[in-house]
Amino acid sequence: AEEEVTEESAPAVTMDDSNCAAPENYCVGLVTDLGKVDDKSFNQAAFEGAQIAAGEIGAFLKYVESTDPKDYTANIGQFVAKEYDTIVTVGFLMAEASAAAAAENPNINFVGVDQFQGETLPNLTGLIFAEDQAGYAAGYLAGLMTKTNKVGAVLGTDTVPPVLYFGEGYRNGVMAANPEAEVTVVYHEPANAFTDPEWGAAEAKKQVTQGADIVFGAGGGTGNGALIEIAKSPESGTSVFCIGVDIDQYNT
């Protein structure tokens, strides 16, 4: 009979951050600028990407959810103190804190999501995206689909460049597809711009009441509020539609 060959299992590795400095360990930390990692939008997309990458290389992954911009440096510092190998900071608002931490810790790799790097640092990679093009595609679709020639968008604050790019791209896409369409784009005030689903829902409802049959929602929990308001409408999927952002929000 053919001999069965089995491989000896490798010694179990403790998956925690008690010894990130050891060569055999790899630790990844993630810090959000606002909101939670299960926000069904921007943060979740980043966190799921980090989970996949950590799983592929056998790394330990831990996250911190920021609730106040004043905490950015301290939250990053939690991972620096334990000598994490890579720290991912999520959101435009963390750009300054990320660059400062990277400059002070040249042996740690930093990844800044939605962060343009004005100064090149060898250990800091800024991930930026063509939000205007994505917004344009969403707007073009809305312009083609609308039956009322009225479409809307409910967004986070326009003081955050990626959000503004989404909005302007959306507006231009609508007009390219349907020059007769009326486009209403509203932005939340800077305070709580991404964590106000009630405002998002109210604005989406207002736009539909005014005749919009397509609403684009982008801006964390605020945009989600708009999408949920449209999704729960009796006309949803037949005469009223919404367009999500960042991840496949049909599923989330």
Regions found by a protein language model. Name each.
Residues 1-252:
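A residue-level marker of the well-folded mature domains of exported/periplasmic proteins
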